[in-house]
Amino acid sequence: MVKSYTVGGILMNYYEPLLLTPGPTPVPNEINHALGLPMVGHRSPDFEIIAKKAFNNLKPIFGTDNEVMILTSSGTSVLEASMLNIVNPDDHFVVIVSGAFGNRFKQIAETYYKNVHIYNVEWGQPVNVNDFITYLSHLEHTITAVFTQFCETSTAVLHPVAELGKALKLFNEAIYFIVDGVSCIGAVDVDLKRDYIDVLVSGSQKAIMLPPGLAFVAYSNRALQRFQEVTTPRFYLNLNKYFDSLQQDSTPFTPNVGLFRAVNAYADLINAEGFKNTIKRHYIIRDGLRAALRALDLELLVEDDFASPTVTSFIPTDKDELTHIKSTLKTKFNITIAGGQGKLKGKILRIGHMGKVSPFDILAVVSALEVILTDYRQTNYIGQGITKFSEVIHSEA
């Protein structure tokens, strides 16, 4: 569908939609091509070749030496799986809640378990590692595991996961450290051994730039042993089944064959760019966008040191301005961004910039914001945002 907007009496057409939500994200042509290839049997040598490549291709993205498990399901499924395969029914464990997806971990925990300890962090703030370790030291129970987000998608905070992992190891090396990386894996530097992470999960539709439908589990060797020991009932989400099948280059249940192929197409794209360059691109775009939003007098929710490289949240002047920005981007410029979630609904807007996103995509939304705010606030912002954005891209690239 063609969107049109009149500027100075000239009709401006926007033929291609620009999706800038924090998931799903735009899918590259190379991946769409892989999705369109002829179907093969999921219990055939053809699929075994595809699966083996996919399990191995994800290793550098997740910072692990172990083949990565792939489930045909949503990201929430592996949040649940990470808990059911680590925590026994009577164990005590901690969930860090700093936003809507930390709250999802909490909801999963309270569905299955009775000894759940919640550590609340102000939405928009990172977890303070020293304060959290002090909190653990005052608990009167032996803690089996700690669950946290890496990037809290609802606020755009990137938690200091490496620092937290090291601190947990020093505090009590027996504690399992489980990390939800759904909205940042593929755009950040992570290493399971270095960061003392036992389970790291993610989904296909964010920085890994596939359609929704696959979920991923990376694991330490001691976590793999723990999967075998845990008695919590589970069936489809029993990770032992996935590991056993992985050893045979297969899956325990019918997989999405096309998306497995797409994983390999994704890996080819990342190898061509160089994964370090992929990470750098995300951080440069983040810095440029933040500078541009400030130039447009839009307040940022998250401080610079803990800002995610995959999603940026900002605070319009009021709810009316928020509604106007979001709707006008869509109706007049064919650009889709996201609103707030949970307690931040109606208070912030979020721009996703992960996966198949270039500086030119962000220039489009920045220039659109200039036009929208100039009209709405009756203040001239034309050129201010794109100038700041371009300066950052030039200096950091």
Predicted segments, located by residue:
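Active-site C-terminal subdomain of aminotransferase-like
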Residues: 26-27, 205-291, 295, 397
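A glycine-/small-polar-enriched, mobile loop at the entrance of the PLP active site in fold-type I
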Residues: 16-72, 76
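Conserved PLP-binding catalytic core of the aspartate aminotransferase-like
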Residues: 299-332
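PLP-dependent enzyme catalytic core of the Aspartate aminotransferase-like
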Residues: 6-11, 343, 347-397
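Conserved active-site segment immediately N-terminal to the catalytic lysine
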Residues: 193-205
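Active-site phosphate-binding strand-loop segment of PLP-dependent enzymes
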Residues: 127-186
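Conserved beta-loop-alpha segment that forms the PLP phosphate-binding cup at the N-terminus of a helix
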Residues: 65-94, 98, 102-106
